[in-house]
Amino acid sequence: RGRNITWFVGDESSPMALRHYYRGGLIGKLVTDKYWFSGLKNTRAYREYQLLIELEKRQLPACRVVAANVVKSGLSYRADLLMKMVEGGQDLVALLTKSPMSDELWQEIGKTLAIFHKNDVYHADLNAHNILMNKDNKAWLIDFDRGEIRQQRGQWCQDNLDRLLRSFNKELNQLPQFYFEQDNWKTLMAAYNAELAIN
């Protein structure tokens, strides 16, 4: 089981995703979905909710949040987040197991990542599962748990990109079919750097 689990709810006219917060790592095997409560504003759901509201204000391509739910029990809490689904959204792993992506799509991803970084947005788990292409072939980022707006760009931007590249290489090594080549990464980075150069 991953760190978070998502259910798809709503109807065709208003599809939404409901994500329950689960712990990952070793502690997640002992305490699956309980977190220490030290105030509402410190909860994972509240912080992600506030971040997604800010990203929407900045018109960045991230999931539009609908509601957050925090249930306190003694000294701990459980939490959920309800978001609108990205119309026609498919993550990069799903896409790349089917067929190669065009240079234009790789450029779109690179440009989008640069726009988030120009807005000082830190994504704590940037990987191929957390980037979606929508029905119009526009890139969206999802899962901003533990993300934040930082004071300025720095080494964390490169760390984000390094994490994403490791994710592509991990899928390439683990999946029987995954259409990713180093030239794809070069195309992504060229678009990323070109966007960063624009004031």
Stretch-by-stretch model annotation:
Residues 1-90, 114-118:
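Conserved ATP-binding subdomain of kinase catalytic cores across diverse folds
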Residues 79-84, 138-144:
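A short beta-strand motif that forms the metal-chelation/ATP-contact edge
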Residues 87, 128, 146:
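Short, glycine/acidic-enriched loop or turn micro-motifs at the edges of active sites
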Residues 91-100:
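AlphaC helix of the protein kinase catalytic domain
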Residues 104-112:
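Conserved alphaE helix
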Residues 120, 125, 143:
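Conserved catalytic-loop position in the HRD/HxD motif
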Residues 126-133:
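Hydrophobic residue at the +6 position relative to the catalytic HRD Asp in the kinase catalytic loop
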Residues 139-199:
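C-lobe/activation-segment region of protein kinase-like
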